[in-house]
Regions:
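Short, intrinsically disordered low-complexity segments
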Residues: 1-2, 20
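A metal-dependent hydrolase metal-coordination microenvironment
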Residues: 22-137
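Boundary at the C-terminal end of the N-terminal hydrophobic targeting segment
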Residues: 16-18
Length: 137
């Protein structure tokens, strides 16, 4: 009896911890596929508080189809905890999780300059490290 109760208890907690996806239903426009996306996310490699794979899990749970992790180039408050970390690292860590979850992952970064061009996101990059320059001119 104890084994049966243990099995039922274990099954309940195992099944209840499975990630549930909140499906968002937005109709497609004829000839196009509608995607639910978030193109501005931060991780611990910037001023976020979670690991890149957690952002992918959140996106899946929220019903998103595509995300861009756009960690800051200039502002990295956790830099001393991850010395030498590449600006591409968050994408690299999230890539396998995104693929397994069916989430389209876009490589990007956030550029924050004191003067024009100011504050913007760069998406579809091949190398985020190329943006890490002292002057934008």
């Amino acid at each position: 009896m104890k084994k049966l109760l243990f099995f039922v208890f274990l099954s309940f907690f195992t099944l209840s911890s499975a990630q549930v996806r909140n499906e968002i239903h937005i109709p497609d426009i004829m000839g196009y596929k509608t995607l639910k996306c978030d193109f501005h996310m931060h991780t611990v490699f910037s001023d976020g508080l979670v690991w890149p794979t957690v952002r992918v899990s959140e996106a899946y749970a929220e019903g998103l189809d595509a995300i861009a992790i756009t960690d800051h180039i200039e502002y990295r408050p956790h830099k001393s905890d991850m010395p030498g970390a590449s600006h591409n690292r968050s994408f690299e860590l999230a890539e396998a999780s995104a693929k397994a979850s069916g989430i389209l992952l876009i490589r990007g970064s956030e550029i924050t300059r004191a003067m024009a061009p100011g504050h913007s996101n760069a998406l579809f990059l091949s190398d985020c490290n190329a943006l890490d320059v002292p002057a934008w001119q």
